[in-house]
Amino acid sequence: MKLLEDRILNDGDVLGENILKLTFLTHQVDFELMREIGKVFAEKFKDTGITKVVAIEASGIAPALYATEALDVPMIFAKKAKNITMNEGILTAEVYSFTKQVTSTVSIASKFLTPEDKVLIVDDFLANGQAAKGLIQIIEEAGAHVEAVGIVIEKSFQDGRALLEEASYPVVSLARLERFENGQVVFKEADI
């Protein structure tokens, strides 16, 4: 997605060998860009029968919400912290965050997923694939089907895509980062 790649080049900060800071996605969200991202995902998956979009809080919510709006289906986001209102029928998975270097237990209320659901997972970044893997575990535990994993930005130099594709989950990434070179992003051809 050229619009996204241009924004990454203009506003992205490469931190070290494998971290890209993008505040338009993770802090002060650019809703117009997120709306375009949502439309692209919706166009790609409009004929697949998607019934739900699933994301993990927090940065995955914005692109997932706009994909949900464009697909006209409900969105569910996995919570990273348990609260007292989620006290029964909870599906959980352990998820390691590459950026934060911590493991979180993410959860979704089981009543929101059924065996009839065809799910599109939407996430902001794909690095080692652990967030998507955790969501897949929860979705399949509910008996629902993962139709595809939609990624805003993929770090192609890490093994997340291979992990998901080896398990037969289609991955669609709007921007694919091949490497960082001299503090700059080098792109690989995106899926869309």
Curated annotation (Swiss-Prot):
Gene name of this polypeptide: xpt
Disulfide bonds: none
Primary role: Converts the preformed base xanthine, a product of nucleic acid breakdown, to xanthosine 5'-monophosphate (XMP), so it can be reused for RNA or DNA synthesis.
Enzyme type, top EC level: transferase
Keywords: Cytoplasm, Glycosyltransferase, Purine salvage, Transferase
EC number in record: 2.4.2.22
Name under which the protein is recorded: Xanthine phosphoribosyltransferase
Protein family per UniProt: Belongs to the purine/pyrimidine phosphoribosyltransferase family. Xpt subfamily.
Pfam families: Pribosyltran
One Gene Ontology biological process: purine ribonucleoside salvage
Residues binding 5-phospho-alpha-D-ribose 1-diphosphate, per UniProt: A127, N128, G129, Q130, A131
Compartments in which it is found: Cytoplasm
Quaternary structure note: Homodimer.
Gene Ontology CC annotation, any one: cytoplasm
Residues forming coiled coils: none
Reaction catalyzed: XMP + diphosphate = xanthine + 5-phospho-alpha-D-ribose 1-diphosphate
A single MF term (Gene Ontology): xanthine phosphoribosyltransferase activity
